[in-house]
Every structure is written in structure tokens, then in C-alpha cells.
From Swiss-Prot:
Domain of life of the organism encoding this protein: Bacteria
The protein's role, per its UniProt record: Required for the timely initiation of chromosomal replication via direct interactions with the DnaA initiator protein.
Species of provenance: Shigella flexneri serotype 5b (strain 8401)
Protein name according to UniProt: DnaA initiator-associating protein DiaA
Protein family: Belongs to the SIS family. DiaA subfamily.
Subunit structure comment from the entry: Homotetramer; dimer of dimers.
Alphabetically ordered keywords of this record: DNA replication
Keyword set includes Secreted: no
GO biological process: carbohydrate derivative metabolic process; DNA replication
PANTHER family noted in UniProt: DNAA INITIATOR-ASSOCIATING PROTEIN DIAA, SEDOHEPTULOSE 7-PHOSPHATE ISOMERASE / DNAA INITIATOR-ASSOCIATING FACTOR FOR REPLICATION INITIATION
Lineage: Bacteria, Pseudomonadati, Pseudomonadota, Gammaproteobacteria, Enterobacterales
Entry keyword annotation includes Transmembrane: no
A GO molecular-function descriptor: carbohydrate derivative binding
Length: 196
């Protein structure tokens, strides 16, 4: 059991090192995309399933409340938090539309959709991205594996942050770290610290 624990930590560290080498440009582009949208008076819509939903909620909460330092609230909405809306849509046998309907209702040109999907093939996330495209929104996609169907939907203005791994647990860990990185970059770009 001890060796398995060490192997989990080692694999996680190796994934972090690979991501640190492969992803800085994509993360930087994503952060600047989010910052520019906020500076233009727009908002960020976020969605994901399971652990990805938790990462989406964490991002939205960090924007609305704060990340590590006090600052004004920033407009972000996690689309997976309203159980009444989600179950009403799902009850009409529209499971694949639970996020797309919300994107069509709440999204506007200039807004950003932060779509989180480890494999990039979740039907409801794919449909949300398709809806965001019709609303002239920009997409920041957090994926893994080969990017899945989601990667093929992205245009030149969009950003994919694809974790270099084929293990869902490692991808989800790195998605959380990436969300924290994005929050840090947004805060330090919009509200630079005097002592930095």
C-alpha cells in the first residue's frame, strides 16, 4: 500500500512537471482572454460535470468572492449550481442541453465560456460550447487526453488548455491547479500588488 501511495504522488508530480513545460503559453493566453472580457464589462460562464463541476464552481466563487487577496467582485456564473434549472431541463429529457440552454439565455457576445471536461467528450459540455459559438462568446476549454470533440469545436480566438495526461485523476488535479493559476493571473493583472 505504501508503494501505491508513493506512485500516486510521483505520477501527480510528473504530470505537473510535464504541464509546467507544455502549458504556460496556453494558460497565459487564457488568462488574458478572461481579463480582456472582464475589462470590457463582460462575464464568465463556467461549466463541468462531476469533479469538473467542482472546479467550475471554485473558479466562479474565486471571481465573485476573492482568490487570495481582497478585491472587488468579478462577474462569473457556474452553470452547474442551480439544481432547479438543471433538473427542470433534464426532466424534459434534455440532459445534453442543461448547460446550452443556460448559455443561450445568459451568454452575450464578449462573454467567455470556461468549459471543463477531462476527456472533452461530455455531450452537455460540447452542446454548451456549440451554444457559446452561436452567441459570439470566446471559449476557454480545460481538457485532457486528446482533447476530444471539444477540441475540434474551438476557433482561433479560443484557448484549449490540454493537460498532458491520459489519467482522469491526474487531469482533474491539474485542472484545479490551472484554475488556481488563472485566478492568480487575473487578480495580479487587474489588481497588481504594490509590493510585487
Amino acid at each position: 500500500m505504501q508503494e501505491r501511495i508513493k506512485a500516486c504522488f510521483t505520477e501527480s508530480i510528473q504530470t505537473q512537471i510535464a504541464a509546467a513545460e507544455a502549458l504556460p503559453d496556453a494558460i497565459s493566453r487564457a488568462a488574458m482572454t478572461l481579463v480582456q472580457s472582464l475589462l470590457n464589462g463582460n462575464k464568465i460562464l463556467c461549466c463541468g460535470n462531476g469533479t469538473s463541476a467542482a472546479n467550475a464552481q471554485h473558479f466562479a466563487a474565486s471571481m465573485i468572492n476573492r482568490f487570495e487577496t481582497e478585491r472587488p467582485s468579478l462577474p462569473a456564473i457556474a452553470l452547474n449550481t442551480d439544481n432547479v434549472v438543471l433538473t427542470a431541463i433534464a426532466n424534459d429529457r434534455l440532459h445534453d442541453e442543461v448547460y446550452a440552454k443556460q448559455v443561450r439565455a445568459l451568454g452575450h457576445a464578449g462573454d467567455v465560456l470556461l468549459a471543463i471536461s477531462a476527456r472533452g467528450n461530455s455531450r452537455d459540455i460540447v452542446k454548451a460550447v456549440e451554444a457559446a459559438v452561436t452567441r459570439d462568446m470566446t471559449i476557454v476549454a480545460l481538457t485532457g487526453y486528446d482533447g476530444g470533440e471539444l477540441a475540434g469545436l474551438l476557433g482561433p480566438q479560443d484557448v484549449e488548455i490540454r493537460i498532458p495526461s491520459h489519467r482522469s485523476a491526474r487531469i482533474q488535479e491539474m485542472h484545479m491547479l490551472t484554475v488556481n493559476c488563472l485566478c492568480d493571473l487575473i487578480d495580479n493583472t487587474l489588481f497588481p500588488h504594490q509590493d510585487d
